[in-house]
Structures are given as C-alpha cells and as structure tokens.
C-alpha cells in the first residue's frame, strides 16, 4: 500500500487596493444613505441602505478571507484558514436574512399607513448610490473574472446597483403620480430579493461547511475516469470537498491490477485529477487488494451506488 500527498498553491485570493477602496466607498455611502432613509422615512431607501451594508460586509469578507488564506497551516489548523471565508459568508447571509425580514415588516406596516415622501432627497440618495457602485464595479470587475472570492463581492455590489434604480423609480412615481404605495410595495419586493440572496449565500456556505461535494464535481464521473486509467481495477472511498470557493480537495482508494506499476498509476491518476478536475490537493491510497473497511461503509459513496443499482 502506498500513499501520495501533494498540494499546489494554485490561484491564491488577493484583496488588492481596488477591494479596499470599494469597501471604503460603499461604507461611507451606507452611512449617508441610511441617514437619508431615516430622515425621509422611505422604506425603499432604508431597504437599499441595509443591502448596501451587506455589500460592505461582502467586500470585507472577501478582503479578510484573502488575507487569512495566506496564513500557513499549523498543527491546530492543518488546512490553514481557508474556511474563514465560509464562516464569514454564513454570518453575512444570516445578517442579510434578518435585514430582509425587517424590511418586509416595515413595508407591510407602511402599506396600512402610507406617508408622503420628499422625493428630492431620495433621488440624491439613488444618484450617489449609482456613482459609488459604478466606481466600485470598475475597481474590482477585472479581478472578479479570475477570483471566485472577489466575484461574490461583485454580486453584492450589483444587487445594490439594482436597489438604487428602484429608489429612482419610487421617487419619480411619487413625484409625478402621487402614488404613495409604490414605496412600501417596492420596498417589500426588494425585501424578498434580499431574502432570496440570503438563502443562496447561507445554503452554499452550509453545504461547504458540511463538506459537501462541489456543485461542478460529479463523484460518479470522477470514479469512472479513474477506473478508465490503465492499471486501475477499482476506485472506491472517493471524496471531494471544498476548503473554500474554488479550492477543491480529493481523496480516494485505488485498487490496482497485479501486473500494474503502483507508482505509475499514482502519477497518472494524480495528474488527471489536477488537470481535468482542478483539485489543488489530492490524497490517493493505492491497494493491491481491498482492505478491511467494514466500519466505514456509510461514507463510501461508490459502494452505496453499486448496492442501489444491484
């Protein structure tokens, strides 16, 4: 029996000055927008301010995760600090969920008692938001194309951009038609958008924390690819999980044919897993005969699939 363990740095997350400037711009604008929202009493402005705060959190999570990812592993954290991004995303999603519920309740209360709103401050708030978001998008757009961590922050900013457009629509409808219910209606609608966004963030974070298989990886397909290699008789106890976004890990057992060269099989399998599926860290156990794994049937996906097909 032989084992090989290997790791590759791959693409390390990087915060960069663009991310930091974006965080500062968005943070300052959140304070201004929340002040305008409380002053005018606009549910749409307040809901967008909450989401702007979430965007600040998303950018800060990306920055902190990028910096923590560079910390070396130690005896207490043998995989390093990659999971900091996932924990931060879960907290961010929970906060976004709470904000969504608050906005929906505020909107429902305002439906029962609509109030006239000063539209000029609302338009100024939206204009400032669009300017801030355009600058932020320009700062991190290029980096988001190659960094999944930054891409998450980018989507937060895009959602705040949509919120600013909703404020403009609200202010213009009130100014030219006097239809006051547009504010709570759009506020509630945006609250449900926040609810949807929070669910997506929390679902993905929980899936990763539970060491779920990445969405773009099929264990069945990987097993078949391994068994198609020369010298591999069987692949079992295969596991794939993500330390954080885009950092995939794989482990598995390979039973090789009696006339096969274990080292050659190991090298070929390792290269295929890295090049075809993008695993940055792989642990493969090579066997000439299946070992006693009677206490681990529950976590052998390949065995469960074979039994279900029998």
State where each predicted segment sits.
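Alpha-helical transmembrane segments and adjacent TM-loop junctions that form the membrane-embedded core
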Residues: 2-21, 44, 50, 54-310
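The first (N-terminal) embedded transmembrane alpha-helix
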Residues: 21-33
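Short, hydrophobic transmembrane alpha-helix segments
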Residues: 34-48
